[in-house]
Amino acid sequence: MIFSMLRKLPKVTCRDVLPEIRAICIEEIGCWMQSYSTSFLTDSYLKYIGWTLHDKHREVRVKCVKALKGLYGNRDLTARLELFTGRFKDWMVSMIVDREYSVAVEAVRLLILILKLFYPECEIRTMGGREQRQSPGAQRTFFQLLLSFFVESKLHDHAAYLVDNLWDCAGTQLKDWEGLTSLLLEKDQSTCHMEPGPGTFHLLG
């Protein structure tokens, strides 16, 4: 009986008029999906996270992205996210230019996680005691995504804040000086159609 009640709970609480209730609901659904994946990590429940990605309240959107980070971060669960990824990938990408900076930063972190998941060659592997970078193309994709977010957000005075927030989850990519130098030397910047702002080189450096 209790389990039956829990299964019906998200349908009500995800649409609650109070954003605090919606945020708590999404956070708990994410936990349930990780702990009881057989029962809750299904399209019937994933859709609630997908729908609330565009909730009008910042905290709800943040909880959604964090819940997804927990799911995509568990390789044992990612196979069940295939349909969700195909359905909501465009929306997840669009969140990197969210009007709320905290949401945008979490969205970038999520996409970095997904990038590493589907393009494992972008990770740094250690061979013979020396770090060797794999697939420059994957590194390039990461930087293009990050620079697109930085330019489109028009927050050029906050590059240091962005780097600080991404350092723990993408420190190895941010320290890819060779890749960064290659982007800086390009004549045709495919990631944007405007001159870099005053903080762009601080972001890259």
From Swiss-Prot:
Family from the record: Belongs to the SCC3 family.
PROSITE patterns: SCD
Domain SCD: 10-95
Gene name of this polypeptide: STAG3L1
Keyword annotations from UniProtKB, A to Z: Nucleus
Coiled-coil stretches: none
A Gene Ontology term for the protein's cellular component: nucleus
Coiled coil listed as a keyword: no
Top-level taxonomic group: Eukaryota
This protein's name: Putative STAG3-like protein 1
Family matches, as InterPro entries: ARM-like, ARM-type_fold, Cohesin_Scc3/SA, HEAT_SCC3-SA, SCD
Alphabetical list of Pfam families matching this protein: HEAT_SCC3-SA, SCD
Subcellular location: Nucleus
Organism of provenance: Homo sapiens
